Each structure stands twice: as structure tokens, then as C-alpha cells.
């Protein structure tokens, strides 16, 4: 790997436009004394897909870079290479991947270290990404897998000379802080971003043009290959079973969910399905699962998809241990191998086994756990930064890439079989947008989980604020409401045998004690899960926009209007799809402040289960309101005025051949339109450009609702995917 040399601090800069007119530039910083020995390990060299060049070409063409590329400079130091990037005096900065502790990064230092327990606002993250977005309408990616430190206008050089004392008439008392919060508050003090990339003497900087802030994010996602498009069933409800369940108990849970009319598409099995779990054998535990093929067949008969928990550390009893030993790291984790997924041999062995043992037997997804790093607090369980891998990476570089590499290895199994997966992964890095893997965490702070939904949209990531243990009935329902309005509606009940709506107290649940009056709570939970099922067509169309246009499914308000200063600090509201404003209520709140963005009016969402007492209230945009929530069915979700919102009949599962009966809710009196995405919901045939279509819905007060296919001569692969049964004027 290239190292900084003390003989010269000079760095040369070479800027090129990646594709003419498409708004992406690369600035290469290298030592003036010549090419460094070796090449830096980068995310771009291990990306899952090439750039979506045709989609980039459909964006607004950009002739000039959004910042002066010559102003991006570097210098070598003993610690590595230091990069300086200009930042305007009024610009604010967001991004850096899955940041759970803060939204705006201006004035802060962030070190992007992979960490399974990011408990402070330091930059540690399950999925850090060295990519930031400016309110001036551009994005910057520092293409490194090192634990880079970003200083966002937080430091500057001292004054070049002393200053005379103030004249008597000009004297002002010095400000003295009276509390530590004010004393150490982050402040902007310079006009540049400094990025320290340790150990390296060369680095590439990618600049993504807008012209808007959202356009810059879209360009980054499209340059990554376009956003993930999950199978339709992946947007249903997920339920991970108790970790100690055996085959009989898993089948009992499945039948119980169906009998109770609790919507569910995916059942996840936790560590107990394997003979060895820490590290993994990837062998069925025949004592608990004597006939997995029969279990899979029965679950499929009930229209469940099956998702298996695992991690990539390979136990000595695994059938693939010997084949992976030469292509693994030099240090073990839980006595298991750490495969080097940068090597095709390691990927082929690992994927080949999983394909034959599981995917060919109708396992349709995996939960890729423990692929981030140790928590740095209780146990250094993962491989250290000084580990060495046969592909040339050290442990630090591998930690940055491990989640992406692992997910790509598993994703390719399904791509080769032309069958979509939607899975989970606990780590990620740059260029991850195409990967159909959703991030999650063992942490559980409710506000952090909400912030994760918002921040993931800056960097081409998907995040699930999963539901696990709950402190009360209210806590369960409020967490369920947030998770059904996220990229993945996941109930992770691995710690309790009974569904949490029958007993939220973990100890009592494990003791088999039903909660008095559990039926009422189950009914409330069912209504929340059915809301998700109603929104599946809307969400699927939003994911299609993510894939084809790069528009995040969940995004911060500041992305839509960075000039509205109110948006810049809002880290507890987000836009879901094109038209929904979501402001989740935290446990314990009976009222909350909601900001309604300017530019249009907003109408409170309403259906038979939610906001029934308030009704479809209309509010002008550009104002704060106090939303009263006297009961758990009060849900602050607002619809942009003059929107068509397709709501499906709530089915018990989406399945592989759904037919959605749609009622189109009409919000507002002016003309409104919506495009529903149509394909088979299962395959990757949409990638060939001919196996999908858009169903355009239009509402005019005079003529009512009409629909048409937007691409003439191309019928959708499933002509019966949507059946419009009516329209409802809500407000």
C-alpha cells in the first residue's frame, strides 16, 4: 500500500470528467515524487455494479463542476495524506453514511470507523460512508477504505501575527461560557473541509454535481449503479422467530400468524438452525430441524419466504472450511475463518455452497450479521485492524469493505438465478445503493433509529428501525408505526417465543404468560401492519424511482428544500416516497411539533384505523404545528396536497403472484397524477429495459380518475398486478 514519504510534502492534482456532461468528476491526488508503490484499496474498485450511465444521461446536463476542482488540494504528512476541499461560508454539510447521533455535520470532526456499538457522535458507525452532501447542491466522495477523519470547517491556522490590545473605547468583555454544552458547542471557523486519510499517499476525490442537493444524491446513487429494487414480497411484513425455536415451533408460529390474520411475508430463523453458530457451520441442526426440506415446503405452502441468519466466520466443522482456509485472513474470529471476499475463489466457494445448500431449496434471503466490527466496549470479538488478508488488504480496509463484499457475494447467487432477494446486513460502505440489503443494529434507542431512517437517504443506504423488546403497549405500537413507514417492516422477536403483541414483557413472554387483554393489543398491532400492506404499491413505485432515478425512498426534509432554514436541523421527520411526510411519535409523547414544508399545503392522512377523530385536516405549508395524539391511532402522516395515493386492500401476505385491489385516495381539488410501477415483482428482467411499464393515474375534477400505460406498445409483464376498484376524495 502507498505510504507518505517525508522527502516531499508536495502533491499533484489531476482532474477528469468521468462522462462528459453527466456531472461526475474525479480529482486524483498523488505525490509529486512519482507514483506510489501499490494502489490504495478503494470502494470504487470493489463496487457491485457499474454506473447507470443511461440513467445519468437522462438527468439535467452539467457543463461545469460545482466547485473549482483546482481548489481541491492535498499535502503529505507523517500520518498520511491531508486533503482540503473548499466550503462556502453559508454551506451546510450532511451525510457520511449511517450516522445515528446527528444530522448536520458542519463544524464537527467525524472519524469514519466501523463499529458495532456507535454510542457517541464521533463518526463511528455500522456503515460509514466517506461521502457528504452540501446545501449548495453537490456531493463529495473521498474514495478510501481507511478510517478517514473529516473536519467540516472546524479548524483553521492561527493568526499570522499578534494583535494590539483594543482601545479603551472599543473594549468589550470576553464571552465566558457558564456550562460545558456552550463551552464545547461545534462552531464553523474556516472555509474548507479537511480530510485526513491515514497511511496513504494518494487518494481520489469524486465530485457529484446537482444542480440541487437532491440531484447530487441522485447522481451518486446512479453512479453507484442505481438503487436497489426489492421483490414485491420484500415490502411486506418480516418476523424473525425466537432464537431457540425448533422446526415444530417455527411451523406453529407460522400457523399462528396466519390464524390470527397478522400480515407476514418473511419468517426469519435465528442462530439455532445451525449446528454451530459462533462461528458458523452452515449446517442444519438435525436435532432441532430434522427435516428442513419439509419445513420449507410447508412454509412455502403458507406463502412465507424463509430468511436464514448467519455470519461469514466459518467454523472448522463447516463443509467449506478447508476450501476457504488458503483464501482467508491470518486471524480467526470465534475460532472461524474470515474469508477474503475480494478474491473470486473465496466468493465462488462461499456462494456455491449457499446456492446448492439453501437457495436451490427455496431459501430466499439471508441476515448477514456481525460483519461490522467489535463494539470496542465489552469484547474485541472481531478481527483486528492489523489482520492480513491474501488479497492484500489489512484489517482496517477489510472492515470498511466487509459488509459490501459479503452482501455482493450473496446477492450474486440470486442474480445468477434471476430471482430477487431482499435481505439484511449489518455493515456497508460507499457505492452500496444497488445492494438489496437493509442495515440494522443491536442498539435500540428510538430516536437514533429514527435518525438512521433519515440519514441513510444521503448515502445510498437502506435502514430498518426494527422492533425488538418493548417497555409497554404504547412502546410497541409506536415502534411498529415507525417500522412500517420505513424501507423494511421488521419485527425481530428473536428474544421472545410469543409475538410481542401477546406479551411485551420479555421475561413474562419467555415464561409463557399471556398479557391480560392481549387481544386488544393484537388488534391494534394488526391495524399497523395492515397499513404497511396498504402502502406496498406506493412503496414499490418509490423503490422503482430509487432504482431508475436514484431518488431515495426515505429522505431528510433538507434534501427537498435546503434553502428553507427550518429543514436543516429536523432529524425527526422525513419524506417517504414522493408525497408522504412522516413525523413519528416517540413513546411517551401525547403531542409533538411538526414542521410542514413550504411550497404546498399538507393534508393529514386518514383511513379507517388512523386519524379517525381528526379527519383529513388541511394545513398550509411553511409552518410549525402542534400535533395532538390522545390515542395510539393518532398518526402524524401528512399527504402533499393534490396527490393521488394508491392504497391496496390489506392482504395477509404479498406473495409471489399478488393482485392488488387499489382504492385511489384523492387529496386536494386540483389535477393530480401518480405513476404506478409494473413488473413481475420477482425477476431481474426489468434490467433489460423491456420487461416493465408504468401505469399513469390521473385525476381531474371534471372527469374523475383515468389510467394509461405510459410506454406505448409495452404491456406490463403482469397485466393483472393492479385492479383499481375505486377512487375516494379525502379532502
Model-derived features: positions:
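Catalytic-domain carbohydrate-binding cleft regions of carbohydrate-active enzymes
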Residues: 3-46, 53, 61-634, 639
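Extended Gly/Ser/Thr-rich low-complexity repeat segments
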Residues: 34-56, 714-730
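Accessory, solvent-exposed terminal regions and/or long lumenal/extracellular loops of proteins
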Residues: 637-731
Amino acid at each position: 500500500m502507498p505510504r507518505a514519504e517525508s522527502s516531499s510534502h508536495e502533491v499533484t492534482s489531476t482532474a477528469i470528467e468521468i462522462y462528459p456532461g453527466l456531472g461526475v468528476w474525479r480529482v486524483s491526488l498523488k505525490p509529486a515524487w512519482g507514483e506510489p508503490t501499490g494502489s490504495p484499496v478503494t470502494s470504487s474498485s470493489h463496487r457491485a455494479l457499474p454506473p447507470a450511465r443511461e440513467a445519468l444521461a437522462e438527468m439535467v446536463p452539467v457543463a461545469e463542476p460545482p466547485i473549482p476542482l483546482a481548489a481541491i488540494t492535498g499535502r503529505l504528512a507523517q500520518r498520511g495524506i491531508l486533503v482540503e476541499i473548499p466550503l462556502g461560508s453559508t454551506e451546510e454539510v450532511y451525510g457520511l453514511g449511517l450516522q445515528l447521533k446527528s444530522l448536520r455535520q458542519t463544524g464537527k470532526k467525524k472519524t469514519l470507523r466501523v463499529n458495532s456499538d456507535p454510542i457517541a457522535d464521533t463518526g463511528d458507525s455500522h456503515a460509514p460512508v466517506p461521502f457528504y452532501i452540501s446545501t449548495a447542491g453537490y456531493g463529495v466522495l473521498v474514495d478510501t477504505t481507511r478510517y478517514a477523519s473529516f473536519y467540516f470547517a472546524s479548524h483553521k491556522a492561527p493568526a499570522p501575527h499578534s494583535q494590539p490590545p483594543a482601545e479603551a473605547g472599543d473594549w468589550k468583555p470576553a464571552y465566558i461560557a457558564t456550562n460545558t454544552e456552550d463551552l464545547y458547542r461545534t462552531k464553523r471557523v474556516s472555509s474548507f473541509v479537511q480530510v485526513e486519510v491515514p497511511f496513504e499517499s494518494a487518494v481520489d476525490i469524486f465530485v457529484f454535481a446537482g444542480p440541487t442537493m437532491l440531484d447530487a444524491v441522485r447522481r451518486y446513487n446512479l453512479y453507484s449503479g442505481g438503487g436497489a429494487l426489492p421483490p414485491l414480497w420484500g415490502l411486506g411484513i418480516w418476523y424473525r422467530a425466537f432464537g431457540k425455536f425448533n422446526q415444530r415451533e417455527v411451523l406453529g408460529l407460522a400457523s399462528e400468524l396466519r390464524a390470527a390474520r397478522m400480515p407476514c411475508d418473511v419468517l426469519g430463523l435465528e442462530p439455532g438452525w445451525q449446528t454451530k453458530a459462533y462461528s458458523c457451520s452452515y449446517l442444519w441442526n438435525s436435532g432441532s430441524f430434522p427435516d428442513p426440506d419439509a419445513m420449507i415446503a410447508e412454509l412455502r405452502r403458507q406463502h412465507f419466504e424463509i430468511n436464514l441468519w448467519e455470519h461469514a466466520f466459518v467454523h472448522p466443522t463447516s463443509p467449506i472450511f478447508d476450501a476457504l482456509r488458503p483464501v482467508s485472513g491470518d486471524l480467526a474470529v470465534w475460532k472461524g475463518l474470515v474469508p477474503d471476499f475480494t478474491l473470486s475463489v473465496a466468493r465462488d466457494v462461499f456462494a456455491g455452497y449457499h446456492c446448492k445448500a439453501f437457495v436451490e431449496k427455496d431459501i430466499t434471503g439471508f441476515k448477514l450479521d456481525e460483519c461490522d466490527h467489535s463494539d470496542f466496549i465489552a469484547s474485541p470479538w472481531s478481527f483486528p485492524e492489523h489482520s492480513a488478508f491474501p488479497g492484500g488488504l489489512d484489517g482496517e480496509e477489510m472492515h470498511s469493505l466487509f459488509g459490501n463484499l459479503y452482501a455482493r457475494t450473496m446477492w450474486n447467487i440470486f442474480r445468477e438465478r434471476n430471482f430477487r432477494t431482499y435481505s439484511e446486513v449489518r455493515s456497508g460502505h460507499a457505492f452500496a445503493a444497488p445492494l438489496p440489503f437493509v442495515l440494522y443494529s443491536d442498539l435500540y434507542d428510538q430516536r437514533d433509529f429514527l435518525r438512521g431512517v433519515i440519514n441513510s437517504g444521503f448515502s445510498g443506504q437502506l435502514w430498518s428501525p426494527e422492533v425488538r423488546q418493548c417497555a409497554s403497549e404504547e412502546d410497541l405500537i409506536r415502534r411498529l408505526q415507525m417500522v412500517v413507514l420505513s424501507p423494511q417492516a421488521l419485527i425481530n422477536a428473536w428474544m421472545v417465543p410469543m409475538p410481542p403483541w401477546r406479551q411485551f414483557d420479555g421475561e413474562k413472554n419467555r415464561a409463557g404468560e399471556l398479557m391480560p387483554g392481549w387481544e386488544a393489543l393484537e388488534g391494534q398491532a394488526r391495524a399497523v401492519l395492515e397499513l404497511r400492506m396498504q402502502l406496498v404499491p406506493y412503496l414499490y413505485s418509490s423503490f422503482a424511482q430509487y432504482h431508475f432515478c436514484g431518488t431515495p425512498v426515505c429522505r431528510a426534509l433538507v434534501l427537498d428544500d435546503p434553502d428553507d432554514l427550518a429543514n436543516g436541523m429536523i432529524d425527526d421527520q422525513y419524506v417517504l416516497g414522493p408525497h408522504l411526510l412522516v413525523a413519528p411519535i416517540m413513546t411517551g409523547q401525547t403531542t409533538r411539533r411538526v414542521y410542514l414544508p413550504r411550497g404546498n399545503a399538507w393534508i393529514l392522512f386518514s383511513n379507517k384505523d388512523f386519524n379517525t377523530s381528526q379527519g383529513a385536516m388541511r394545513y398550509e405549508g411553511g409552518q410549525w404545528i402542534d400535533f395532538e395524539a390522545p390515542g395510539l391511532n393518532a398518526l402524524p402522516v401528512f399527504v402533499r396536497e393534490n396527490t393521488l395515493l394508491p392504497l391496496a386492500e390489506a392482504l395477509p401476505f404479498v406473495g409471489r403472484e399478488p393482485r392488488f385491489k387499489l382504492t385511489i385516495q384523492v387529496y386536494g381539488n386540483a389535477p393530480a397524477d401518480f405513476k404506478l410501477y409494473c413488473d413481475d415483482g420477482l425477476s431481474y428482467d426489468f434490467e433489460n429495459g423491456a420487461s416493465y411499464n408504468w401505469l399513469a393515474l390521473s385525476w381531474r375534477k371534471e372527469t374523475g380518475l383515468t389510467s394509461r400505460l405510459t410506454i406505448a406498445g409495452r404491456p406490463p409483464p403482469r397485466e393483472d398486478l393492479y385492479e383499481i376498484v375505486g377512487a375516494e376524495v379525502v379532502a
